[in-house]
Amino acid sequence: EFRRVLFRSVVAENMPTGENPWSREKYQRHCALNGLEGVPDDAVVMISDVDEIPDMGKAHMLNNRTTTCHMHMFEYSFKYTFTGEPWFGTVLTKCLEFKTLGPNFFRDNRWRFQYIPLAGWHLSSFGDAEMIHKKLKTYAHAKDPGREHQTLENVQRFISEGVHHTGGKLIGTPKETVMPPRLSCMDKYYC
């Protein structure tokens, strides 16, 4: 059981300014090490993106090994589920390992650790068409081949037709899917 949860905000200063978007992402993640002062070496640390929500109801399945949360992956809202690949998101490990190996090691290797099945939710590209379009133009994959078709008009079509921004078809979320706890700020994303 988690006795105490500690949240700290870390500001990434002196961001890389080059053309490589991955260097910025990795730098920001590395800055998490600056927020560990006073955290015991045996504390559990979660390495996650902001749109990944671990299911704390499955925390009892943790052991003393680094563990990844396999997650339901929703696209645009809870209406659509992405099934193109399994999503292995949040990684949980001990603070000492986190400090020794660094956050990018765990994020880059999250598919290699033991995992808890369906232990959370990845809320990918939630928001209106303008917000999603802005994300697609600025995130680390923005310069990948084939991304030039991601105009605002196409993003609007992707959302209305249930098409992943890379072109694959999304499925309607099955009714039996376990959903995250309902928060009033998320009401517009429930169908």
What are these regions (language model features)?
Residues 21-25, 52-150:
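Conserved catalytic core of nucleotide-sugar-dependent glycosyltransferases
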